[in-house]
Amino acid sequence: MQDTDLKAHFANLDNKPRIIIHCQYVYGIGHFVRAVELASFLSKHFNVFLLNGGEPIMNYAVPDEVFFFQMPSLYKNENSNQLIPVDNSLDLKKCFDMRSAMIEQLVNMTCPDLLITEHFPFGLLFETEVMNLIKHIKSNNPNSKIVSSVRDVIESENGG
């Protein structure tokens, strides 16, 4: 996303505190639905920026009050357990590089007061991305807070 695109998104900002929600999922849409509902509620009192790294969900509307940013999407191949870009013209490194640039640009332009992670710390496939996001936010705003939105159910292989 270009700086001019981001500036257009910020045209309606007020003086409310700013929150970035980092949402990543590789199967299903549960994390996305949770993040959108959380963002929708929080947008009544905050400027909320939802940063989505999973596949776009076309039939689940994000409220207009939430600033939505779709990163290049990744999914996990169930057979190989490998992350794969949804856009097959990208290799994994290029996809992560593009995501990193988008995250850095958003953090620089918003200087968030709060980061909410969805699917982290349990989503260890994205540990480097989220840890870099946290470090970048803290370097821009040392007073920012970090919150983990935990909803994962860890199951054993036998379903117990």
Whereabouts are the PLM-identified features?
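Nucleotide-activated donor-dependent transferases that construct or modify glycoconjugates
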Residues: 6-28, 116-119
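Conserved nucleotide-sugar phosphate-binding/catalytic loop shared by glycosyltransferases and other
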Residues: 15-17, 25, 41, 45, ...
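Gly/Ser/Thr-rich loops at beta-strand to alpha-helix junctions
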Residues: 25-29, 120-126, 153-154
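Short glycine-/acidic-enriched loop or helix-start segments at secondary-structure transitions
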Residues: 31-32, 60-61, 80, 126-127, ...
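Short amphipathic alpha-helix
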Residues: 31-42
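Conserved nucleotide-sugar donor-binding subdomain of glycosyltransferases
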Residues: 85-128
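Active-site-proximal region of nucleotide-activated glycan assembly enzymes
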Residues: 130-160
